[in-house]
């Protein structure tokens, strides 16, 4: 007799319960290695390069990394956070110090979590690099989802399409036409191949300064790109699932890497469903930068931008000022948002 498959909600509930149990256990362990004040040195600046459940790896001004405990007063800590920490006079169970405070963030990138609300992934980002792939097919809808996040966080975005060595001449022309949609509204795009090396120098040049973060679904080749940019890191590369074309998750924790040319790179775990249900319709609408000029000019204040009479957005689309693909993706995103919120409301009542 075959086992009954679990629903996605059941899987998320099981995962959440496991994580909470592990967190409680690690909290108990942490109490055993709390530092006394006279065991700690002077306060110093640092940056979080990796965050674990109750610990974090902090890099000091000299580039040395120390595993630290977190003060219980710290409500949130993520990769990229600039912190005040103190080094211990000795190591205790592999822990070398304590993080005492988080400096104000320049910005943050977050995704919704079904059980814990909004979960911040990284902080103090100068550039978000959206990595997509032509395998199994290039999804503009997924790209638009990431761009909505970027626009709401007010962080510049670069669209990178990987594995273009797999394209025929005709397919390449089609992808180039798709990317022109984004170039025309001011986004930088780049077609690359980690395998053949095409345009990898241009990709590497993006990291000359500032802190960048790779985002993208599993299987798009983020780990392969890191291996090319930082060969000494040797990030684990996952195999593509033969059934879905999506890769297995290969990065378990977000991590910040320093690049030889001076910038930093944050690699985050693959996200198959980058939910946007924490955003309302107005935030989604403002996540489409080419809509900005026309917002507030519709005939009716409560215009849904569908078939409403006097809709400035639809008129702009019909005149070619807004691309029809982006306009269709916008409505697809709004519809999926309403459906997801309805399902969450139903689930919370049962």
UniProtKB/Swiss-Prot annotation:
Ranges of Basic residues composition bias in the record: 1-14
Keyword Transmembrane helix tagged: no
Function recorded in the entry: One of several proteins that assist in the late maturation steps of the functional core of the 30S ribosomal subunit. Helps release RbfA from mature subunits. May play a role in the assembly of ribosomal proteins into the subunit. Circularly permuted GTPase that catalyzes slow GTP hydrolysis, GTPase activity is stimulated by the 30S ribosomal subunit.
Molecular-function GO terms, alphabetical: GTP binding; GTPase activity; metal ion binding; rRNA binding
Source organism (scientific name): Pasteurella multocida (strain Pm70)
InterPro entries: G_CP_dom, NA-bd_OB-fold, P-loop_NTPase, Ribosome_biogen_GTPase_RsgA, RsgA_GTPase_dom
Subunit structure and binding partners: Monomer. Associates with 30S ribosomal subunit, binds 16S rRNA.
EC number(s) given by UniProt: 3.6.1.-
Cofactor names: Zn(2+)
Matches recorded under PANTHER family: SMALL RIBOSOMAL SUBUNIT BIOGENESIS GTPASE RSGA, SMALL RIBOSOMAL SUBUNIT BIOGENESIS GTPASE RSGA 1, MITOCHONDRIAL-RELATED
CDD domains documented for this protein: YjeQ_EngC
Cofactor remark from the record: Binds 1 zinc ion per subunit.
Subcellular location per the Swiss-Prot or TrEMBL entry: Cytoplasm
NCBIfam families given in the database record: PRK12288.1, ribosome small subunit-dependent GTPase A
Principal cellular location given in the protein's record: cytoplasm
Protein name per Swiss-Prot or TrEMBL: Small ribosomal subunit biogenesis GTPase RsgA
């Amino acid at each position: 007799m075959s086992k009954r498959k679990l629903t996605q909600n059941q899987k998320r509930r099981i995962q959440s319960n496991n994580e909470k149990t592990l967190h409680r256990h690690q909290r108990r362990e942490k109490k055993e290695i709390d530092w006394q004040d006279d065991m700690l040195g002077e306060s110093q600046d640092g940056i979080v390069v990796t965050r674990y459940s109750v610990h974090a790896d902090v890099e000091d001004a000299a580039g040395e990394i120390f595993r630290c405990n977190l003060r219980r007063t710290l409500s949130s800590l993520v990769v990229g956070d600039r912190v005040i920490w103190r080094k211990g006079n000795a190591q205790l169970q592999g822990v070398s110090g304590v993080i005492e405070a988080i400096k104000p963030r320049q910005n943050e990138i977050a995704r919704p979590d079904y059980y814990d609300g909004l979960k911040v992934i990284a902080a103090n980002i100068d550039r978000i690099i959206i990595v997509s792939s032509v395998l199994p097919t290039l999804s503009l809808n997924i790209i638009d989802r990431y761009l909505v996040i970027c626009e709401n966080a007010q962080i510049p975005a670069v669209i990178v399409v990987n594995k273009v060595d797999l394209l025929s001449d005709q397919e390449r022309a089609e992808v180039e036409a798709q990317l022109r949609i984004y170039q025309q509204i001011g986004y930088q795009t780049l077609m690359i191949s980690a395998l053949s090396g095409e345009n990898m120098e241009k990709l590497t040049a993006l990291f000359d300064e500032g802190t960048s973060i790779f985002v993208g679904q599993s299987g798009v080749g983020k780990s392969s790109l890191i291996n090319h940019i930082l060969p000494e890191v040797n990030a684990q590369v996952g195999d593509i699932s033969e059934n879905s074309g999506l890769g297995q998750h290969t990065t378990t924790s977000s991590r910040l890497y320093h690049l030889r040319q001076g910038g930093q790179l944050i690699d985050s775990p693959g996200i198959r469903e980058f939910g946007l249900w924490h955003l309302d319709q107005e935030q989604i609408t403002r996540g489409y930068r080419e809509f900005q000029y026309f917002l507030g000019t519709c005939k009716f204040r409560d215009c849904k931008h569908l078939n409403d009479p006097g809709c400035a957005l639809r008129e702009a689309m019909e005149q070619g000022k807004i691309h029809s693909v982006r306009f269709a993706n916008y409505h697809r995103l709004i519809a999926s948002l309403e459906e997801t919120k309805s399902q969450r409301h139903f689930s919370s009542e049962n």
